[in-house]
Amino acid sequence: MITIIARLPEIYSIFYPLINVLPAIPVFFFLLAFVWQASVGFR
């Protein structure tokens, strides 16, 4: 059990870039929807 707790920072460091990107995902989907509407012609 203690070894698992000791290894947590290593595991977390792998996912740290992913956690940095997470807040930008809704913005990305908003831009994707905007580009899709622009390509359709704002029907």
From Swiss-Prot:
Keywords: Chloroplast, Membrane, Photosynthesis, Photosystem II, Plastid, Reaction center, Thylakoid, Transmembrane, Transmembrane helix. It is a single-pass membrane protein. Its main location: plastid. It comes from the Eukaryota. Residues 1-6 form a propeptide. It is found in: Plastid, Chloroplast thylakoid membrane. Pfam families: PsbK (PF02533). The keyword Mitochondrion does not apply. GO terms for cellular component: chloroplast thylakoid membrane; photosystem II reaction center. SUPFAM superfamilies: Photosystem II reaction center protein K, PsbK. The chain crosses the membrane at residues 14-34. InterPro entries: PSII_PsbK (IPR003687), PSII_PsbK_sf (IPR037270). GO terms for biological process: photosynthesis. The keyword Membrane applies. PSII is composed of 1 copy each of membrane proteins PsbA, PsbB, PsbC, PsbD, PsbE, PsbF, PsbH, PsbI, PsbJ, PsbK, PsbL, PsbM, PsbT, PsbY, PsbZ, Psb30/Ycf12, at least 3 peripheral proteins of the oxygen-evolving complex and a large number of cofactors. It forms dimeric complexes. Belongs to the PsbK family. One of the components of the core complex of photosystem II (PSII). PSII is a light-driven water:plastoquinone oxidoreductase that uses light energy to abstract electrons from H(2)O, generating O(2) and a proton gradient subsequently used for ATP formation. It consists of a core antenna complex that captures photons, and an electron transfer chain that converts photonic excitation into a charge separation. This is Photosystem II reaction center protein K. It comes from Bigelowiella natans. The gene is psbK.
